[in-house]
Amino acid sequence: MPNVQSLAIIVTDPRLIISTWKDRCPAPLSSVGGMPILARLVSQLAQAGVQKTIVFALDGIGDVKRILNNRMKRMELVIRIMPTPGSGRLIDLATITEIAEFHGQVLVFTENAVIDPSLIQRLLRSSDRNITVVSRSERRRCLRLLGDIGGRLTAMLPGDSPIRESASADVSPVGIYKFDPALLRAIARIRPHRFNDDLEFFETALGLQRHQIYLMYADPQHVRRVNDATDLEAANFASSSSGDQFSILERLQAGNWRYPASEHILLCNHHFPPASVVDRLRERLQDLLYLQPSDQLDIIAKLSEMTDLPARNLAVGNGVGELIKALYGYLDPRIVIPTPTSAQYIDAVEPNKVSRFELPPENFDLDVEAFANFAKRRQASVAVLVNPNNPTGRLVPVQEIEWLASQLAIEKCRLVVDETFIEFSVAGKGNSVEKLLSVFPKMVILKSLGAIMGLGGAQIGYLASKDEQLTHGVRRRLPLGNINGIAEYLLWILPEFREEWEASFRRTRADVVSFSRMLDTIPELEVHPSQANYLFCRTPEAWPSAKHVATMLAKRYGVLVQNCENQCMKYGDRYLRLTVLPYEENRYLVSALRRINEELVEWSTQSKRAGTAYHLGC
């Protein structure tokens, strides 16, 4: 190949099938953005200036030829059957005859993946002769790689390595490489007899001191493996326009796991769990899925140990939402509730049985005396208090709740307190009213554990009250086996991670302070002090609405935030609720909001000068 300076080798396996309820298709031939994945990669290579591409198919060469017609664009294309198909594709590539006399750049692709074109350009432009593209991922892989400060590969770790918490150990190859053909030829000479294992390939390569291999990090959104139907849906979502992505996500109430999107909406603990918790779950996964979980009474016994409350005073639910419905079903209440608030406490009861107590917009603090009088006037049987408030993050002190409970008790009105986010407050559990349950036996506490464990999919919450008749009545309205095995197992292993759990709350509190200071740099954005893991912000007057800004963030910057236009409050369309994430994600959002603010201030100025509405797009 005297005139070829760049060569690409693609190893594809049409035997890998993606199945849906309506169709079955070889993974490389599955369509993303209207084009088969394999054809998409070949087209990208041609556009990047690669002069020759060799596609090695492990099977189904006819289908591969069919979909690659007219994809060359002045690039030579060769389709071959893989000579020795096995589990170690890199070892096989080292022996192929096509590179016997080749001296240019060799790009290698061994995974069925949707790749951002910029990554191919980075590989071609790099002066490094040998590169392995890596990414950080929560998925366990068969091989993990370690590099030195200069980015050179120094060691490998098999997937079953005991090292878990090292950030370096979590870097894995994504199936994209650039090799000096001399390295491939050298490995072929050293390993004429092989076990077809990629670990063996890198072990051999590390022994060749003349051929250093460098690690190139790729953002996860730049390499999307497609091995099943959910991967395919995620890849199609990622390849769609920002407007289409926003339309999909705006309709979702849950199920975000299917779509790759950055978001400041999910109210979970982002510093927990550590990877070792997930590893423990993985080790037990087969039993947790195959065998039935325990019934309520067994799980309540474990909750009793965790909360230090008697089992007879507890009920456990598949999330707080299930407990709210069971509680309301038992009480048939007329409720009063401060607003804005969590919608699930309002939606679970008939509209004519809800009275909303509006919180003052200057600070959204609850006046407990005014609220007690409001409950009395409305002859409420239940007063609901979410503390810290969702979405405002404001906290009612324990002493004030104690006074409120005493006044409501006189009127035979129960106080229901949701303490889901109490651990994120400055005093943590010190702000809980669990200590008041003995004083006010009619009081009820509700709490979601999934949120503070950082595992929204765990779906477990509990109800606590000294009113045993109530807890028994709530239990009778719940399925006997309403908690999944994964959530149950978490209750068993969490004691091993108490220190990490407590540390996660401290880290979140620090993030709240840091994020609030960053947001304060945006002119006229009013950030309310928060005792939760989210911030409630009133938008500047120059912004058309919170929803408009949320749309701009989603479409232009790929970030989802919660606009509060549907909250039960005045001027809800002026407010955003922003979940506090680790520093880099917070910084990215603030940077995007600054740029949006500059544009909207300019838009507002132009509108005033023109004396009419100046066109503004999302």
Swiss-Prot record:
GO biological process, one term: biosynthetic process
Keywords: Plasmid
Domain of life: Bacteria
SUPFAM superfamilies recorded: Nucleotide-diphospho-sugar transferases, PLP-dependent transferases
Recorded family membership: To Rhizobium NGR234A y4qD.
Protein name listed in UniProt: Uncharacterized protein y4rO
Pfam families: Aminotran_1_2 (PF00155)
GO MF, one annotated term: pyridoxal phosphate binding
